[in-house]
From Swiss-Prot:
GO biological process: dUMP biosynthetic process; dUTP biosynthetic process; nucleobase-containing small molecule interconversion
Superkingdom of origin: Bacteria
Active site: 129 (proton donor/acceptor)
Disulfide bridges in this chain: none
Site description Important for bifunctional activity, residues in chain: 116-117
Binding site residues for dCTP: 101-106, 119, 127-129, 148, 162, 174
Protein name, as recorded: dCTP deaminase, dUMP-forming
Gene (name only): dcd
Presence of the UniProt keyword Nucleotide-binding in the record: yes
Subunit text: Homotrimer.
Family indicated by similarity: Belongs to the dCTP deaminase family.
HAMAP family: dCTP_deaminase
Entries under Pfam families matching the protein: DCD (PF22769)
The protein's role, per its UniProt record: Bifunctional enzyme that catalyzes both the deamination of dCTP to dUTP and the hydrolysis of dUTP to dUMP without releasing the toxic dUTP intermediate.
Length: 193
């Protein structure tokens, strides 16, 4: 079940959802808007000749910070990691989904590539996978609305929520845009036929 605005407010009041800072005017009919933080990560194209998700490539991205009143310029065809200003926490009874804002989509800005799903039990700043598919550079301002989160009630509480010992939760409690940690649980089936 997708939560409505009144359900989101009630879930927040009951402690099922926490966004810090919480701003009531960010609540939409069936979502809550989230804002862009000041931290970004860009690929360091000179450190490696390729990306391998099975390896720890610690120097693959480099973090940058802009001032609170300075924009980050995302150039055409560029990919950068960003993060939400809000620290998000959801309990084991809910899951969430991050979607882009349609007004930004109409400018060619994609908020995430594939990682829009947020597991029950997650807490931290949400890493954004920002892309500019337009033909012009776009200014991204700290504090601007960058996406919206919608919440889903689970049929029963998660037995092993994100952050529990059994889930291998590599991004729990993350601050700022967190680079890939795919090497920590890399899985590859042996294809024989």
């Amino acid at each position: 079940m997708l939560l409505s605005d009144r359900d989101i407010r009630a879930a927040h009041a009951e402690g099922h959802i926490s966004l810090d800072p919480w701003t009531d005017e960010m609540v939409q009919p069936a979502s809550i808007d989230v804002r862009l933080d000041r931290f970004f990560r860009l690929f360091n194209n000179h450190a490696y000749t390729y990306v391998d998700p099975a390896e720890n490539q610690g120097e693959l991205t480099e973090q940058f910070e802009v001032g609170p009143d300075e924009p980050w310029i995302l150039h055409p065809g560029e990919f950068a990691l960003g993060s939400t200003w809000e620290y998000v926490k959801i309990d084991e009874t809910l899951a969430a989904r991050l979607e882009g804002k349609s007004s930004l989509g109409r400018l060619g800005i994609l908020t995430h590539s594939t990682a829009g799903f947020i597991d029950p039990g997650f807490e931290g700043h949400i890493t954004l996978e920002l892309s500019n598919v337009s033909t012009l550079p776009v200014k991204l301002w700290p504090g601007m609305k960058i996406g919206q989160m919608c919440f889903f009630q689970l049929s029963s509480p998660s037995e092993h929520p994100y952050g529990s010992e059994t889930t291998g939760s590599h991004y729990q409690g993350q601050r700022g845009p967190t680079p890939s940690r795919s090497y920590q649980n890399f899985y590859r089936a042996q294809i024989t036929d």
